[in-house]
Regions:
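Trp/Gly-enriched beta-strand surface patches
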Residues: 1-62, 110, 123-124
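Extracytoplasmic/surface-exposed domains of secreted proteins
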Residues: 26, 34, 52-56, 62, ...
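Exposed beta-sheet edge/beta-hairpin loop segments within beta-rich domains
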Residues: 56-63, 363-369
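Short Pro-Gly-centered flexible turn/kink motifs
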Residues: 60-75
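Non-catalytic surface loops within mature trypsin-like serine protease
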Residues: 75, 106-108, 152, 175
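Glycan-recognition and catalytic cores of secretory/periplasmic carbohydrate-active enzymes
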Residues: 80-86, 95-99, 114-145, 152-170, ...
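Short edge beta-strand/loop segments characteristic of extracellular beta-sandwich folds
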Residues: 88-90, 101-108
Length: 499
């Protein structure tokens, strides 16, 4: 079986014809497709692949290079139809003291305007709380928007907002609204389930067995992988194509869908967690992580801080790869298409026996901006791990400092990344070399404040220079005016300019 040629073995179509009508029973969903040439064929997408949808196709006639397939698509139009109002509230809920605004999305052809009703859900049913007058916000993209402010309501409980026949989901107002089920599921479920090189249990359930314990073989040179990884004419390491590289069968989280480990995903997630740990002093324990036996137990505390255990897990992959390869890996990914399309237990991708044909490949690259960004992420992770895994912390810092020292800067993108690395290394070490580099590049930082402001601001106290702080503040004030203007362009009060 090969996913690329799966369609060479065409299953029988459900139906064949020149016209196809979808949902003829529903005027609001009905549409018709008519082919002016080759017949339409309706397939079950599960036959040749595992696609959970129906497939409508026409075969391209042999030798036809223009006008090979011509379809006419006719949606059914219901005169006077209007999109129903959509009432939007926070999915998390609200703290009693915070601003509370419900936003109602309206069809732009709907002239009607009404009041909204805030109701409380009690053990005896609904109790009216307040009639809300809307603020006309105006048009954003395809819709008109109204805003209904109910900040004054602070009594804790369950609520919903109703506008005409539409209503919001039920939400909470409570002082403990952020204590459960907000960011916590990332630590409780998402990251543990994605952990590579582990068996992940949750009571009776096994999310996946020990996987990829045979990682990884050096990728072939001059190879453009089907997922987009590119190995150039050299491996950039002492290893030759096909060599088993030690130190890679530990740590990391699976990328969604194809289970690969990208350096920016691994180091980047560690960075997110490290900054959250520092900013909010997160101390949360719901999971057992046993690195020695490569076992994870979800919802079984082990007395160790989960966020630090996850930073450790990511750094084991990044630092392990760096120390084995002498450089960062670009990514670790399966070598065969049959593995790439795997739906099921990640442990089924390889046999966990090093050195055979099913082992994943490790790719390398020469990419200064990515290497310097990773240096910043390594430095921050090193801080978080100090006192938790001192050896790994020291190795992460060594890698960060070496990357900072040896990576060349040839363009603004690389310079921005080196400023990022300098800021985090200054916070980690306090060394003058990093402080001096930030001071030398003050003008560049101010000029690129949109991208570098948050980075420089993190280090401003460590730089401890009045001129640096003053110039940074001036640039930040200009940026704030720009962001305020962008935020005013949406009913949600956040900037939105699609690329």
């Amino acid at each position: 079986y090969n996913p690329i040629v799966a369609d060479d073995l065409i299953a029988e179509p459900y139906a064949v014809g020149q016209r196809f009508t979808c949902r003829p029973d529903d005027a609001y969903s009905r549409f018709t497709i008519e082919s002016e040439g080759a017949p339409l064929k309706l397939y079950d997408g599960r036959m040749n692949h595992n696609n959970g949808w129906f497939v409508l196709s026409s075969e391209i006639p042999e030798g036809k290079t223009e006008g090979a397939v011509r379809w006419i698509i006719k949606p059914n139009v219901v005169p006077g139809w209007l999109s129903a109002p959509v009432v939007q509230v926070s999915q998390v809920g609200y703290h009693p003291a915070q601003p509370k605004v419900a936003i109602v999305e309206l069809d732009r052809n709907d002239p009607a305007r009404g009041q909204a009703a805030l109701v409380k859900i009690t053990e005896n049913g609904e109790v009216p709380v307040q009639t809300l007058n809307g603020e006309e916000w105006g048009q954003f993209l395809r819709y008109e928007y109204l805003r209904f402010d109910f900040t004054a309501v602070q009594e804790e409980g369950l609520y919903k907002v109703r506008y005409g026949a539409s209503e919001s989901a039920i939400f909470r107002i409570a002082s403990d609204v952020y204590d459960r089920g907000v960011w916590q599921p990332v630590l409780e479920y998402f990251l543990p389930v994605q952990m590579c090189h582990m068996r992940v249990n949750e009571k009776y359930r096994v999310w996946h067995d020990l996987c990829h314990d045979d990682d990884a073989r050096m990728a072939p040179v001059n190879r453009n992988h089907f997922d987009g990884y590119v190995q150039g004419p050299s491996t950039l390491t002492k290893y030759q194509p096909g060599d088993s590289v030690p130190g890679l069968n530990v740590g990391g989280w699976h990328d969604a869908g194809d289970f690969d480990l990208r350096i920016e995903s691994q180091a980047g997630e560690c960075y997110i967690l490290a900054l959250a740990y520092e900013a909010f002093n997160v101390n949360y324990d719901a999971t057992t992580v046993d690195q020695a036996h490569k076992v994870v137990e979800i919802h079984q505390p082990d007395g160790r801080n989960d966020i630090l255990q996850q930073i450790e897990h990511g750094m084991l992959s990044v630092v392990g790869g760096y120390r084995s390869l002498g450089r960062l890996y670009r990514g670790i990914i399966c070598s065969h298409l049959r593995q790439y399309v795997l739906l099921g237990d990640s442990a089924a991708m390889t046999k966990n026996i090093k050195g055979d044909d099913d082992d994943r490949w490790v790719f390398t690259e020469d990419n200064p901006p990515r290497e310097l960004t990773t240096a910043a992420q390594l430095a921050a992770s090193s801080r978080a791990l100090k006192g938790f895994n001192d050896e790994l912390s020291a190795h992460a810092l060594e890698a960060a400092q070496e990357l900072y020292r040896v990576t060349r800067v040839e363009d603004d993108k690389a310079l921005s990344a080196k400023i990022h690395a300098a800021a985090e290394l200054l916070l980690t070490t306090g060394e003058e070399v990093y402080r001096s580099f930030l001071l030398e590049n003050l003008n560049f930082i101010a000029k690129n404040i949109k991208n570098l402001g948050w980075i420089a601001a993190r280090a401003v106290k460590a730089v401890n220079d009045a001129h640096f702080e003053s110039e940074l503040r001036k640039a930040m004030q200009t940026l704030k005016q720009e962001l305020d203007q962008l935020s005013a362009e949406t009913p949600y009060g956040i900037p939105y300019h699609p690329y």
